[in-house]
Amino acid sequence: MSFTFLNQLPTPDEIKRDYPLSPELKELKKQRDAMISNVITGKDSRFLVIIGPCSADNEDSVCDYVSRLTKIQEDVKDQLIIIPRVYTNKPRTTGEGYKGIASQPDPEKAPDMVEGLIAMRKMHIRAIEESGLTCADEMLYPENWGYVEDLLSYVAIGARSVEDQQHRLTVSGFDVASGMKNPTSGDFSVMLNSVYAAQHPHHFVYRGSEVQTTGNPLTHVVLRGAVSKHGNTTQNYHYEDLIRLHDMYAKMDVVNPAAIIDTNHSNSGKKFKEQIRIAREVMHNRQLSSDIRGLVKGLMIESYIEEGNQSIGNHIYGKSITDPCLGWEDSKRLIYDIAELNAK
């Protein structure tokens, strides 16, 4: 019933000094951030595809996967902006299990937060260097932002974190597109209140300092489905869900109303192959309604080199050790399909 203080963590400035981003890649990130911002604000009609492994567990296979997206991005550049998922923190429903490379650089060894912060930054830098694509990550721990704020072009706040005040206030200081997921209950009001909070300025304590933020106008919602009080999954990507969200957004004092649809989690019931059908349904609904087309700015898809998932210790290259993912061939075909549907 007490804390044992194990190690003093390096500061963000120390980690960034030891693992810097080159001037060329800083410029690349600036350009990518601007493109993504223009999609969220409605200045660019391209569509966002945030795609990658459930959790970024292995630097080699994750960077291999991300590099494969480079050619596809070139092929679909007129229709899509691909944002690789490099999720270095894994929220756990019960608190048990693999919590991501930022906590546990080697899934088969004990946690090591110091090495984890280094592994997190190194993986993101390598992914950008090898692919030319800046990535997305989930900000499970708000205090980690400083270690990657110069690397990420998209941030997600998860279903279990979205009601937390510190997460909301911290996002108000981010300068990149940030998606607030609906809570596991599915309550749209909670999700929209988190967007309102993050879009407005705040005065609070962050990493031992008193800080002030200006608000993040690029904060938006992510629909990931829900779990009922009886433990059943319910979906929230259907036509009527999106119209309801559009109408609720209209009553909020927020700017840039936008939504990303998470095709996995409770929307698919974790039946990973359903992501293909769900993605196509969302794109079809965008064709049916100008309101939905204006609202839905992208899809979030869980995908890796090998489909499905595996137990830790099986060592199948490019296969998820957490939630099951689409395999590469299905993912590639789906991205091209999304590009074609966005053009209609």
Please describe what each predicted stretch is:
Residues 40-43, 70-77, 125-130, 213, ...:
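Acidic (Asp/Glu)-rich catalytic clusters
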Residues 66, 79-244, 265-266, 270, ...:
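Active-site-facing alpha/beta catalytic cores
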Residues 304-342:
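Internal helix-turn-beta structural module
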Residues 54-57, 256, 264-270:
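Short acidic, Gly/Ser-rich segments with clustered Asp/Glu that frequently serve as metal-coordination loops
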Residues 25-38, 72-83, 89, 120:
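N-terminal beta-rich core of secreted/periplasmic extracellular enzymes
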Residues 1-41:
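N- or domain-start disorder-to-order transition segments that initiate the globular core
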Residues 48-61, 323:
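Conserved phosphate/anionic-ligand binding catalytic regions in large, soluble enzymes, centered on
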